[in-house]
Amino acid sequence: MRQTSSSSQRGGSRSGQGSRRRRSSKKGGVYTFYSRLVAGCALAVVALLWVSAASVHVHPDGLGILAWMGLMFPAFLAGVVCMLVFTLLLCRQRVWIPIVGLLGCCLTIRQYVPVNLPSPAPKQSLKLMSFNVMGYNPKEKDADGRTSMLRYLSRSGADIICAQEAALSVKLWKESHGDPFVRTLPYCDTVQIVGPGGSNGLTVFSRFPIVGKRKLCSSATNGAALFKILIGKGDTLNVINCHFESNHLSAEERSAYREMVHQPGRQELKEGEREHLSIVRKFSQSAVERARQADSVASYVARHPDRSFVVCGDFNDTPVSYSRHRIAQVLDDAYEQTGNGIGRSFNRDAIYVRIDHLFVSPEWRVFSCRIDRSSGQLSDHYPITCHIKRHAALPE
C-alpha cells in the first residue's frame, strides 16, 4: 500500500515537473518571438533613419524619393527615440539597437537640432540678417504709409540684410520710406529673378557700400544673386542672397499636406491619393531644381577660395537636404555652430522646420545665430540672424 502511494507521488511529481517545463518552454518561446519582433521593428526604424541621414549625399535628380526621405528625418528620429524608451522599459536586451542607431547619425542630429553654449556678440562684429519678407507685407501699413515690415528692418540693428521676395528699386525705396530708414541702411540694391515688375527680387540693404552685383543662377521664379559689399578699405564681402526653388503648392495642396501630417485618415481615398501624388511630384521636381541651384552657388564659392563669403536665404529645404549639405561642403553653417533647437523659420501650415539658412567663410567666427520670432506674423517666415567677426586671414 505504501509502495503504491509512493509510486503515485513520484508519478505526480514527474507529471508536475513536465507540465512546468512545458509552460516554461511555452513562455520562453513567446518571449523569444516578442524579442525578435522588437528587434526587427527597431532595426527597420534605424535603417530608415540612416537612409534619411545619408540622403543628403545623393543628388535628387533621378532619385526624388530620397528628398522625401530627408524631409521625414524628424519622424524617423522620433521613431528611434520611441524604440529606445520601449526597449529600456520592456526589452532591455535589445536596447543597443536604437542606441547604435542614434550614435550612427549623431552628426546629422546636431545639424537638425544643434545645442550650443551662449555666444554673446562682441564689439565691432557685423550683424547679418536673412529674411523672406513676402513682398514687404504691403497690407500692413503704418500711419505714415510705411509698412510694418520696413519699420522692423530699420530697427533690427542689422548691418547687412538679405531679403527674398523683395523686389524694390533703389529710387522707390528712397522716395517711399523716408530718411530714418535710409540713414540706418543707406545702401540698397536688387537683382530681379522673375523680371521687371516681378515681386520675387533679391534685395540687399547695407550699412556699407554695395559695389557690384550679378545673378548667379535662376529658374522661372527663383535663384541666387551675388552682391559685393565694401566693409572696409580693400575689404570686400561677397554676399550671395538665395531663394531656391519653391514647391509651388496650391492652397488645396497645402491643406492636403496639413491633413497628411495631422489627420491622414480624414480624406476620401481617391481625392487624397490624387492630392498626395501631386504633392510628391511637385516636391520631387522642385528638389531637383534646388539641388542644381545649390550646385551653382557651391561651385562659385569653391572657385574663389581667396574671397570672403556669406551665403544665406530661403532654401525651401530642411537641414537634412542635398541643397543645404552642398553649401555646407564649402562654408560653415552659422546656426549649427551657435544656434539652439530646431529653429523653426517657416511659420505657416504644418511645417515646423528650419528652411532658412546662413553660411559664412571659415575665417569668420559666428556668434549668437538665432531665429528671430519677434517679427511676428509680418511674413510667413521668421528671419535668421547672427553676428560675425573675422578671426583669421584669408588664404593667399
Protein language model features and the residues they cover:
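Soluble or luminal CAZymes and related metallo-dependent hydrolases
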Residues: D144-G145, S219, K282-S296
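A solvent-exposed, charged loop/short amphipathic helix patch at secondary-structure junctions
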Residues: R254-K282
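Active-site-proximal beta-strand elements of phosphoester/diester hydrolases
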Residues: S125-N137, T236-E245, E273-F283
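Metal-dependent phosphoester-hydrolase catalytic domains
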Residues: Q3-R14, Y31-L88, W96-V100, G212-K215, ...
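Residue-level marker for buried hydrophobic side chains located in beta-strands
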Residues: L128-M129, C162, V311
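Structured beta-strand-rich core segments of catalytic domains in phosphoester-bond hydrolases
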Residues: A75, L103-S125, E140-K141, L150-R151, ...
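Active-site charged/polar residues at nucleotide-handling catalytic sites that mediate phosphoryl
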Residues: S156
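Active-site metal-binding loops of divalent metal-dependent hydrolases
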Residues: F131-V133, A166, F244, D314-F315, ...
